[in-house]
Design a protein with these regions (language model features):
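Conserved nucleotide-binding/hydrolysis micro-motifs of P-loop NTPases
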Residues: 44-47, 91-93, 106-110, 148-149, ...
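Conserved motor-coupling elements within RecA-like helicase/translocase cores
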Residues: 66-100, 107, 121
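Amphipathic alpha-helical transducer elements in NTP-driven molecular machines
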Residues: 2-6, 47, 86, 133-144
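Short mixed-charge
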Residues: 18-29, 58-83
Length: 186
């Protein structure tokens, strides 16, 4: 997921004319070069993976103290607003960006569940092991409402389209169905 997000974000944030046309189609907005971007994950390890993947494109770098940071040219828009933020759901509370990538992280071949999940008799515990933070309605709400124009969820569509997903995280399944119905699943 991190590499997919990095490639798309790099294309969009460094847009040429063909990408600008594509972004205009997505956002219905002519002011594409001034778009802001957010990358949200439920897990800090995935945030670091996204930073690392974006380093290849010159969008992120390591600071002198070893922490990750966004390269200067991608930090702010001309009007001073934040251009790019990468972080966990909690870092996005109260924030909005034109385009948000939501990295779901969770994936599982439902036919090959590990024994500790497959043998779990309590449905709620099984769901928690499979979906983790996705089951937090507050976090899911924050993660799926930070975009002004485009929400691009990156994850395992098959996993999101299972009965256990529908039972555990109905909002995610409903969103998947909406995207499928509107023809915007990539």
């Amino acid at each position: 997921e991190a590499k997919i997000i990095a490639r798309r974000l790099s294309d969009w944030i460094k847009s040429d004319e063909s990408t600008a046309d594509y972004m205009k189609t997505l956002t219905h907005d002519d002011r594409q070069p001034g778009l802001s971007f957010g990358v949200i994950s439920f897990y800090k390890a995935q945030v670091f993976a996204v930073y690392k993947a974006l380093q290849k494109y010159g969008i992120t770098e390591r600071a002198q103290d070893g922490t990750w940071q966004i390269c200067q040219e991608y930090r702010f828009l001309d009007n001073g607003e934040e251009r790019l933020r990468i972080g966990t759901v909690d870092a996005f509370q109260g924030m909005e960006f034109d385009i948000v990538f939501l990295s779901m992280v969770r994936s599982q071949d439902m036919n090959a569940l590990p024994p500790h999940i497959r043998n779990e008799e309590d449905d709620k515990k099984k769901q928690q092991k499979l979906f983790g933070h996705l089951m937090s309605e507050n976090r899911l709400c924050v993660s799926m409402t930070r975009q002004k124009k485009v929400l691009a969820i990156v994850g395992d569509g098959v996993f999101a389209n299972t009965q256990i997903a529908e039972d555990a995280v109905p909002a995610l399944k409903n969103f998947y169905d909406l995207c499928h119905e509107k023809g915007v699943i990539l």
